[in-house]
Amino acid sequence: MSYASRIGLMFVFVGAGIGATAIALEAQNDAPNPYRTVPGVWAALPDGRDWGSTSLVEVSPDGETIWAVDRCGTNDCIGRVENGSGQYDDLDVVFQFNKQGRILNQFGAGMFAWPHGIDVDDDGNVWVVDARGNEELMRGHQVIKFSPDGEVLLRLGTAGVAGRTRTTLDQPNDVLVTPEGDIFVADGHPGNGNNRIVKYSSDGRY
């Protein structure tokens, strides 16, 4: 899908949440499907860990690797482990796989509340959207730019703080970086949220 098409879809999705009435549509499942599922478990996580909710995957610009974000084996990265001993801080959430599903890189432990959208720019940098927030832990309501090795290069929004200003976001859900470096963030997940598209320069200026 072209960048222009993806930007257009971001506007459509955000606009649909503004005062729209939900209309139930019956799924159309009779179209031909030329694809087949891969047998077994493709892209297994380390230590036998189960996949949690995964909202989006992204193929690198060179088509050689696949990036995916996992919500800490469940649907939330802020919660208690089964024995009540603490947070899910020790679980990475960002994974890079080769075509065969083998992990090449992983990072992001203790950095996210509810990872949602992801984009890989033309330089191979990985942009991850953290939709929900926790002000006490200073997580969420932001977009984080990583190098391919997991170094934090840029943050958009104020960690853990929801808002509708030039420096804050409220439950952003997706990000897109154009070949020219412009950054578009779809800000707003619930119907009563910000429901806006925010544009930044390549260095994060509003």
Task: Describe each PLM feature range.
Residues 21-206:
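Eukaryotic scaffold repeat domains enriched in small/polar residues
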